[in-house]
Amino acid sequence: MLEIITVRKVFLIGFLILILNWVWRAVNWVWLRPKRLEKYLKKQGFSGNSYRILMGDMRESNQMDQVAHSLPLPLDADFLPRMMPFLHHTVLKHGKKCFTWYGPYPNVIVMDPETLREIMSKHELFPKPKIGSHNHVFLSGLLNHEGPKWSKHRSILNPAFRIDNLKSILPAFNSSCKEMLEEWERLASAKGTMELDSWTHCHDLTRNMLARASFGDSYKDGIKIFEIQQEQIDLGLLAIRAVYIPGSKFLPTKFNRRLRETERDMRAMFKAMIETKEEEIKRGRGTDKNSDLLFSMLASNTKTIKEQGPDSGLSLDDLIDDCKAFYLAGQNVTSSLFVWTLVALSQHQDWQNKARDEISQAFGNNEPDFEGLSHLKVVTMILHEVLRLYSPAYFTCRITKQEVKLERFSLPEGVVVTIPMLLVHHDSDLWGDDVKEFKPERFANGVAGATKGRLSFLPFSSGPRTCIGQNFSMLQAKLFLAMVLQRFSVELSPSYTHAPFPAATTFPQHGAHLIIRKL
């Protein structure tokens, strides 16, 4: 009997210890740790709201988002209060050395070019945070990896994005652009002019361009995959705006079920496509047909495994995750660049004419070629200015793995560092009093001339983790603009509503209605 009582006491004590440990961890997570970090940050000279239990700044941020996103803007209005209302408000209230709260997690805002350079160059000390219940939607493959795993993936994927491979992909871009422009010509054939929502066309075009370039002859299957992934991205954006509750992704909700279904279906389709192309490689498919990215990625992976052993290559799951990451970045960034370039040139007819003159001198009525596109100076200036004003990626985040001592301050372990690229691109201290104006001439001497050597232009990030698809995206944009301006002029429709909106990238909330005229 005594032994039974003793066992019960031991069990009860153990149970109480577990409960107390859980309570301690919960109290530390929701209160003690945030207050400790707040004290640390204020000692380092940062300003921000005092921590409010569990919610932090999220309630105020969500309220400001709802108000800001409900109203359109005049064309000449500053759209930062609409795109990033709470962050913009915080910087105005507390200065550029400030912090906000995402639930119990402090977010340090960094806008100083020298500090940005430190953070971007020391990427191993500032990995991407894993805060949130649905990170896999936005952070997969190369976008998600750190350390040696990132280096391994980057090394294997790099050959697919080299200039010689991009040259072979250009015909795929050309075919997709032709299809869209032929549709425009049919629609405008009666009157020579028509109104359309350019956002829808740009979104569909970049999807088709990416599918053709990525999957070659299997591009129609690629389009189906991208449609599923777009649904997953839309679901993920809803999750981001909700309060993060640890473990919530495992709850049997309709939302979570649909996310799992899209993930399963997408991976199954990627798997089938990858296995088909791997068979082509085994059969010795010639390099003269090496005209799609997936084949190039798999060929590079196969070569690495042969030369360095099986552990040096990427698994099937790795390859699928890298394909997902490339679509997420490629589709959304490029479609955003396309549409805002059309909007900007519709507002600024003088620059539209300058671009058309340059394109005409380079190609006449012929199809644009790689060499000619690489020498388009005015077009490149325009694209850089659009990337500055309407940066597709409007912010990015890092987190400190340990206490980090930077030149101007120190950060404790576990602090999220938010880099608001859009705010940096609109900072008058860095770009001058004309920062809100569309002035491509600021890039006449390239990015280095425009930034005066400071790290203040970050549309594709910077440092070792600069976007692997930067040249890919710029090639798409140059070809798109050249082929459009060879055939059409564009202007804003009276029904155009100016409403930049923060989704996966900066996109027009109510579309981008333009009038196109055949030349």
Curated annotation (Swiss-Prot):
Gene null: resulting phenotype: No visible phenotype under normal growth condition, but increased length of dark-grown hypocotyls, reduced responsiveness of hypocotyls to light and increased responsiveness to brassinolide (BL).
CDD domains: CYP72
GO terms of molecular function: heme binding; iron ion binding; monooxygenase activity; oxidoreductase activity, acting on paired donors, with incorporation or reduction of molecular oxygen
A Pfam family the protein falls into: p450
GO cellular component: membrane
Subcellular location: Membrane
EC numbers on record: 1.14.-.-
Protein name: Cytochrome P450 72C1
Organism phylogeny: Eukaryota, Viridiplantae, Streptophyta, Embryophyta, Tracheophyta
